[in-house]
Structure formats: C-alpha cells, structure tokens
Regions:
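Solvent-exposed interaction patches of small proteins and small membrane subunits
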Residues: 1-147
Length: 147
C-alpha cells in the first residue's frame, strides 16, 4: 500500500472508471434476474470483475487518504471484493444487483467529492488529472461532477 496521498489519484480514477462501466452495463435493467441473464450473463460477469477491480484499487489507496476520508466504507469494499473473488459462483445475484443500483452511486459520489477536495487542496497533481481526462482509459468517468 502506498503511503503518499499524491499517488492515490490514479487509484480513485480507476475505481470511478470501473463504476462508470458498471453503470453502463446495468442501465437498461430494472430486475436482477434480467440483468443476470442478459447477454449470456456477460453484463453480470463483467460487473463482478469490475467490482473485484474496485476492491483491488481501494486496497492500494494510502492509509493517509483513507484516514482523511474515513467515512467511506473502505473495509467493506475490500471485503466484498474478497467475497466475489473467493466465492464467485456463490454470489447472490439479487444482493449484487441491489449493491450495483443503490450503493455504487453513493460510492461514486463520495469518490468524486474526494477527488475534488484533494485537487483543490493541491494534494493531487492537476496535470495528472487533466491527462486522465483526455485518456482513452478513463472515458467512463463523469468529470463534470469533479470539475
């Protein structure tokens, strides 16, 4: 785990990118069973992999940033990642769908606020943030919510 907050921007952007993709994958679904069955379960499986990535990236965030923004559920994010990674087949599709629809937007908003705060406090490099905005790897982030 990194100890310098300046390194955390990339991890938070990776999480926001994963959230943006998941929101794209669930956008057309109101029922968990429809989401689970869609595209031969591709949307569901891709979302699980992105949730694993969210957990991986959150684990890389420095203790300094986690301490500064302790209201975010860092431990639960990592815990859900571990649950998916170690019991992939046993993951409840209804609970997962509920998390994707109801918890992920809250997490997204919290992370956008953290990025905004850390940029304005000069703890993140603005140049690095601007580069990310033009990168093809970060096209699913709602930058308007941060700028």
């Amino acid at each position: 785990m990194q100890s310098d907050i300046k390194n955390d921007l990339v991890y938070l952007l990776r999480i926001l990118e994963s959230i943006g993709k998941i929101q794209l994958y669930i956008a057309d679904f109101e029922e968990a069973i429809d989401f689970f069955r869609a595209n031969d379960q591709q949307n569901f499986n891709a979302s699980l992999m992105l949730l694993i990535n969210i957990g991986e990236q959150s684990n890389r965030v420095s203790n300094a940033l986690k301490g500064k923004h302790s209201s975010l559920a860092w431990t639960q994010i990592k815990g859900f990642r571990n649950r998916i990674a170690h019991d992939y087949i046993g993951i409840d599709r209804f609970i997962t769908f509920d998390i994707l629809q109801n918890e992920l937007p809250i997490l997204k908003n919290q992370l956008e606020q953290i990025v905004q705060i850390e940029l304005s406090d000069d703890n993140f490099e603005k140049e690095e943030y601007e580069l990310a905005k033009s990168s093809e790897y970060y096209t699913h982030i709602d930058y308007k919510n941060i700028d």
